């Protein structure tokens, strides 16, 4: 039911996270001037953490990872490689969650941070929230001269 949305999240977010140089993972657009502004790496960590936590709601089980400091997941993950591995794990876990949504259970209420919601609405939130942060990640990337892979022309079209 939500496989295409999750595949799009995987394609867009993972390719952008891979494209950003490792030395830019600790950079925020205006670091030090806005309290709590996430670095690029923290954006990826937050996105992955929320994928884990939202997928756990869909599955009605305890999330494998808690929110950590500032909803950015495990504090010990710092390198680009560690963060990409965490993101890949989150997407795999979410794939299990969206696979569990069926015609028979998609309207069943599940608890969420916003109160009880249909399982399908919570599953849709995986992509919704992911693309909110993907947009922020695109800004970070472009500020550092990185063209998001999704914006690279695939033939005959002009660059975005």
Give residue ranges: language-model regions.
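Surface-exposed helix-capping loop/turn segments at secondary-structure junctions
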Residues: 18-27, 97-107, 143-148
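Acidic/histidine-rich alpha-helical segments that form the ligand environment
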Residues: 74-110, 117-131
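Alpha-helix boundary/capping residues
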Residues: 20, 47-50, 61, 90, ...
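Solvent-exposed, charged/polar functional surfaces in cytosolic regulatory/catalytic domains
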Residues: 8, 12-15, 19, 89, ...
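Short, contiguous alpha-helical
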Residues: 3, 7, 11-14, 26-71, ...
